[in-house]
């Protein structure tokens, strides 16, 4: 028999991480989906084989249950050109390109979520895609590529790995709808770092301001994600509304009216650095509906103010990666410094009126297989 007392989505935590599969979500209002700002994230030890995609350390944003910054491309087939170059491929997702190169296809191109905190006033997760990039080496996918004519070449996005480290820290600032994303990137040599964003419903708006790039994405449900992007290196911005490889309806797929499906273009933004061995990106992602204006994001040096929240981070190529987030009103703090406390993350949160202190270090997934 079903329980007499029903449960609602409002009872679920605002953040949840499943590190064995490499999935994390952050929400502001699960009890009222129409007003919910959501961020989803993937960095999976299972890699990008079968139906999985080469989207390690990629995120998506949503408002009202509808996508804003979202993975692009169409599933036109399993290994056709559009699928391999513009759907499975890292260039189709909200992640990073290294020298314009993408992540491996196969289980070898994996990521993982080494640490996280599911809190009440703050939430946090870290993805590590340091092992995701390089040439495709999977015998299975090499054979599939041979049968389908896939070219695993630098021109198509696969080359020798030039990456040492790619860690992406994501911090949810309570129920504000603001998500802070801090990327620490280290190369084996000087490379270009390409920061990617995509929308699938409406085009993005790009503003190049004095010390930031502001990218605004929208969905058709009135949702907005404003990405305030800061970088340690000089960047060049671009946006296109065409795919690297155009989709074709070669299977003659039809809609409910029996007409052939036409696959629409999506919008693709990139912010690419000059060649450098070390790079850091900071994104203040403000996701909300038409119920409030955009949050004011004010930068003074390495300090950024967003409402009652203060963000301090290393946005230079020198020294160790570091980020500190605090809200003195709520008495909430998060601190990460790769050069201190053996690189641990410390969190102070307020849960049910009581202070909670956590020290987070890397935790390996506990697989059941």
Where are these regions (language model features)?
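Short, Gly/Pro- and small/polar-rich lid/capping loops
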Residues: 1-52
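Short, solvent-exposed loop/turn segments at the edges of secondary structure
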Residues: 19-21, 54-56, 63, 89-93, ...
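Well-ordered alpha-helical segments within folded domains of soluble proteins
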Residues: 21-26, 58, 280-284
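A structural connector/turn signal
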Residues: 56-57, 168
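CBM-like, beta-strand-rich accessory domains located in the C-terminal region of large
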Residues: 78-369
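Structural recognition of the beta-strand scaffold that forms the well-ordered cores
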Residues: 25, 40, 59-62, 67-71, ...
């Amino acid at each position: 028999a079903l329980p007499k007392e029903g449960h609602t989505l409002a009872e679920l935590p605002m953040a949840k991480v499943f590190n064995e599969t490499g999935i994390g979500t952050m929400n502001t209002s699960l009890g009222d989906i129409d007003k919910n700002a959501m961020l989803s994230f993937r960095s999976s030890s299972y890699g990008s084989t079968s139906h999985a995609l080469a989207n390690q350390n990629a995120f998506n944003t949503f408002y009202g249950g509808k996508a804003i910054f979202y993975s692009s491309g169409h599933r036109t087939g399993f290994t056709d050109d559009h699928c391999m170059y513009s759907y499975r491929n890292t260039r189709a997702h909200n992640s990073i390109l290294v020298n314009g190169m993408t992540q491996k296809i196969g289980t070898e191109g994996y990521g993982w979520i080494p640490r996280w905190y599911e809190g009440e006033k703050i939430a946090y997760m870290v993805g590590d895609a340091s092992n995701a990039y390089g040439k495709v080496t999977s015998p299975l996918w090499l054979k599939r590529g041979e049968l389908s004519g896939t070219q695993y070449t630098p021109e198509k996005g696969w080359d020798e790995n030039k990456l040492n480290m790619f860690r992406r820290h994501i911090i949810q600032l309570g129920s504000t709808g603001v998500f802070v994303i801090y990327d620490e990137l280290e190369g084996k040599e000087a490379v270009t770092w390409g920061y990617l964003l995509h929308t699938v419903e409406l085009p993005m708006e790009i503003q190049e301001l004095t010390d930031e790039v502001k990218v605004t994405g929208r969905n058709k449900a009135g949702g907005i994600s404003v990405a305030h992007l800061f970088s340690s290196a000089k960047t060049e911005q671009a946006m296109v509304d065409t795919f690297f490889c155009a989709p074709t309806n070669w299977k003659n797929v039809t809609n409910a009216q029996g007409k052939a499906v036409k696959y629409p273009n999506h919008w693709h933004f990139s912010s690419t650095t000059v060649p450098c061995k070390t790079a850091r990106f900071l994104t203040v992602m403000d996701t909300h509906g038409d119920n409030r204006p955009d949050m004011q994001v004010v930068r003074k040096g390495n300090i950024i103010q967003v409402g009652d929240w203060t963000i301090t981070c290393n946005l230079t190529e020198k020294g160790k990666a570091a980020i500190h987030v605090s809200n003195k009103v709520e008495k909430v703090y998060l601190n990460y410094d790769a050069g201190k406390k053996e690189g641990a993350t410390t969190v102070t949160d307020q849960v049910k009126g009581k202070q909670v202190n956590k020290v987070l270090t890397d935790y390996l997934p506990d697989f059941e297989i």
